[in-house]
Swiss-Prot record:
Keywords on record: Ribonucleoprotein, Ribosomal protein, RNA-binding, rRNA-binding
GO molecular function: rRNA binding; structural constituent of ribosome
Taxonomic superkingdom: Bacteria
Protein name: Large ribosomal subunit protein bL9
Any Pfam family the entry gives: Ribosomal_L9_C
Length: 149
């Protein structure tokens, strides 16, 4: 199925690209999320007429994401207290929701879907580096300090 991308999509293309994707991917993900429209003649003409407007909107979103990433990077360290055993192992774990709540409490709004934990959830006390994907091409980094209660 041919679609016109309205946003940058990882491993697919950027704004204005006409790409061929499977019908289910387009129908169930790209179109409902507003990332693409079917490439009909009407949509192609409509897109070409609004291309500059869409590019400006995309640039504004990218600028806002960069500003949020700077705020997140400015935090440097966020502390989370959790119950832990003698050897520093946590009772339970600290996941994306806990990290997002702690960063939000520190003053920067973050959704749990933006938190990236490459090594899985945090299960030990100490300092852990956590990445945030604020936008498809904007990343931020914070040190999470897990302390025992």
């Amino acid at each position: 199925m041919q679609v016109i991308l309205l946003d940058k999509v990882a491993n697919l293309g950027s704004l204005g690209d006409q790409v061929n994707v499977k019908a289910g991917y387009a129908r169930n993900f790209l179109v409902p999320q507003g990332k693409a429209v079917p490439a009909t003649k009407k949509n192609v003409e409509y897109f070409e007429a609004r291309r500059a407007e869409l590019e400006a909107k995309l640039a504004d979103v990218l600028a806002a994401a960069n500003a949020r990433a700077e705020k997140i990077n400015a935090l440097e360290t966020v502390t989370i207290a959790s119950k832990a055993g003698d050897e520093g192992k946590l009772f339970g774990s600290i996941g994306t929701r806990d990290i997002a709540d702690a960063v939000t409490a520190a003053g920067v709004d973050v959704a749990k879907s933006e938190v990236r934990l490459p090594n899985g959830v945090l299960r030990t006390t100490g300092e852990h580096e956590v990445n945030f994907q604020v936008h498809s091409e904007v990343f931020a980094k914070v040190i999470i300090n897990v302390v025992a209660e």
